[in-house]
Curated annotation (Swiss-Prot):
Protein name, per record: C3a anaphylatoxin chemotactic receptor
Lineage: Eukaryota, Metazoa, Chordata, Craniata, Vertebrata
One GO cellular component term noted in the UniProt record for this chain: plasma membrane
Job of this protein: Receptor for the chemotactic and inflammatory peptide anaphylatoxin C3a. This receptor stimulates chemotaxis, granule enzyme release and superoxide anion production.
Transmembrane regions listed in the UniProt entry: 51-71, 83-103, 121-141, 160-180, 221-241, 257-277, 296-316
Length: 364
């Protein structure tokens, strides 16, 4: 095969060599005539759409998340809420910074010109973003749960210092869970094709132990990075919803924004995990199709990193207000502590504390 490899011959393994995380086996000599696969035109369409989505995510994500960090982290008074949103924006910004390398990787038909160090670092940044983002969303949900369900505890323990410590813990856990990506990634040079690939080394080392380790990594990623956070967040908002619907708290726009942000995260990352499972455990025909669609799933995960600032703008004000006020005012309203909620929490906390005191005095 010559230096200028035909698009259809190489694109079949695109998803397995893509700069972000890949899951299963890949076939370097993909057969475009395989009836279970997509046509060459289908691959080209996925190729173009992936570039478009990544480009949009890059431009909006870098500018939007940088603006969020500037507003919530620099211009506004430091609160627990602003710390959560700054941490979420920092995770998304980190991911968006790596997108240009991904776009170049797509354009170069998965050729990896950046060396082995970057092969280990860049894919790991995407995994780190996933864990840091979802763990931050869990913290936000638990924080809202404490404010509504455990107001006395929130009044006594909810602090900026604790928020910073928890955000630090999020990054430590994210880094630890991203380490396998660094360990198992390496570059493979194919001189006959004039191409260098960034892949998992289990694609070269097919020993049973190595294969099992990779599968364990992906299952762990699915459970800790998707299923458990989804369960925790769902339970938190189910209980919050019951309390709000009881009429004891007014429905707050802040809750609506956070719910949409959480829902968007899981919708954007669901295809990534589903396709990964199909590639790892599905039948051969399903694996081929999943590999072909994998770039779209990865691009959709990238898009999630640019959506939050957009959601803050479109949900932070009514439409007429959005026209009249500056973006800074919109963001400040989104990130500010909810006065009505805090008043309700404080009143309920005082009421509970008063009842507890009266009960103690009666017993004496």
């Amino acid at each position: 095969m010559g230096d200028n490899m035909d698009f259809s011959e190489h694109y079949g393994n695109f998803s397995e060599n893509y700069v972000t995380e890949s899951y299963g086996e890949f076939d370097l000599y993909y057969d475009p005539l395989n009836e279970t696969s997509l046509s060459e035109q289908g691959h080209r369409s996925i190729w173009v759409l992936s570039i478009v989505l990544c480009s949009i995510a890059c431009v909006l994500g870098i500018t939007g998340n940088a603006f969020v960090i500037w507003i919530a982290g620099v211009k506004m008074k430091r609160t627990v809420n602003t710390i959560w949103f700054v941490n979420l924006a920092a995770a998304d910004l980190l991911c968006c910074v790596s997108i240009p390398f991904s776009i170049a990787d797509i354009i170069l038909n998965s050729h990896w010109p950046y060396g082995e160090a970057m092969c280990k670092i860049l894919p790991s940044m995407v995994v780190l973003n996933m864990f840091a983002s979802v763990f931050t969303l869990v913290l936000i949900s638990l924080d809202r749960f404490a404010l509504v369900i455990l107001p006395v505890w929130a009044q006594n323990h909810r602090s900026i210092t604790l928020a910073w410590l928890l955000c630090g813990l999020v990054w430590v856990l994210g880094l630890l869970l991203s380490l396998p990506s660094m360990i198992y990634r390496e570059i493979v040079v194919h001189d006959d094709m004039n191409i260098t690939l960034c892949i998992y080394n289990h694609l070269q080392d097919k020993t049973e132990g190595n294969q099992s380790a990779i599968k364990a990594i992906h299952v762990t990623r699915l459970i800790l990075g998707f299923l458990i956070p989804l369960l925790v967040i769902a339970v938190c908002y189910l209980l919050i919803g019951r309390r709000v619907s009881s009429g004891r708290f007014k429905s707050q726009r802040a809750f609506q924004i956070i719910l949409v942000v959480v829902t968007t995260f899981f919708v954007c990352w669901l295809p990534y995990h589903v396709i990964g499972l199909v590639i790892e455990y599905g039948k051969e025909a399903s694996q081929v199709m999943a590999r072909a669609l994998d770039p779209l799933a990865i691009s959709l995960a990238y898009v999630n990193s640019c959506l939050n600032p957009v959601l803050y703008v479109f949900m932070g004000q009514d439409f007429k207000e959005r026209v009249r006020v500056s973006l800074r005012k919109i963001f400040e309203k989104v990130f500010s502590e909810d006065v009505t909620l805090r008043s309700s929490v404080y009143s309920k906390g005082q009421s509970q504390l008063s009842r507890a005191t009266n009960s103690s005095e009666a017993q004496v």
